[in-house]
Amino acid sequence: MSWLVGALQTFGSLADVAGTVSNIVYQQRQAAQLEKQNELMETWMNKQEALQKSQMELTRDLSINGPAARVQSALDAGFDEVSARRIAGSGERVIWGNLDRPIMHAGTMDSIRQTKHLDSLSHSLATFKNGTPFGKPAPPTTKFGKPQATTAQINIGHNPGSSSV
């Protein structure tokens, strides 16, 4: 019976040793997984830092060169200089006659400039407002400002000749 108890104790001790070895192997695998996770996290953080630096450089570049790039892009797309600046956000207005000109493509601008339709409309509106210059007297000239004092002028040394008629 003691032989059987000794064998059972040996098997129990071997089972305990196997459990301990298994636990050590598991802990080593867990440590390896944590190490791999830390390496991945470090790589990810380095990439995030590089992306943030790149984003800051891009934001800085766009804040400095962005408006010029937008204007150049609009010019390359065929807009005239004023329309390109307006597309880029300049806020300037272009008034022809009594009309506020919208943003137009350069081809549209050329056709308007060649036909002079906008100029003729502006002149006709001015005619309705001011009338025609035909048959009207010239408007009086008005001079504004401080009056200039003049001094008397004496003609010295000029003796007109005499005539006998």
From Swiss-Prot:
Q: Where in the cell is it found?
A: Virion; Host cytoplasm
Instruction: State where it is primarily located.
Output: virion
Q: Which cysteines are joined by disulfide bonds?
A: none
- Pfam families annotated for this entry? Calici_MSP (PF05752)
* UniProt cross-references to InterPro entries, sorted A to Z: Minor_structural_calicivir
Q: Which GO terms describe its cellular component?
A: host cell cytoplasm; viral capsid, decoration
Which keywords fit this entry according to its UniProt record? Capsid decoration protein, Capsid protein, Host cytoplasm, Virion
Q: What else is known?
A: Translated by a ribosomal termination-reinitiation process from the bicistronic mRNA coding for VP1 and VP2.
Q: Which family does it belong to?
A: Belongs to the sapovirus VP2 family.
Q: What's written under domain?
A: The N-terminus domain points away from the virion surface.
**Subunit organization:** Homooligomer. The portal-like structure consists in 12 copies of VP2. Interacts with capsid protein VP1.
* Job of this protein: Minor structural protein that forms a portal-like structure at a unique three-fold axis of symmetry, following binding to the host receptor. The channel formed by VP2 may allow the delivery of the viral genome through the host endosomal membrane.
Name of the protein: Minor capsid protein VP2
Species, as recorded: Sapporo virus (strain Human/United Kingdom/Manchester/1993) (Hu/SV/Man/1993/UK)
Its lineage opens with:
Viruses, Riboviria, Orthornavirae, Pisuviricota, Pisoniviricetes
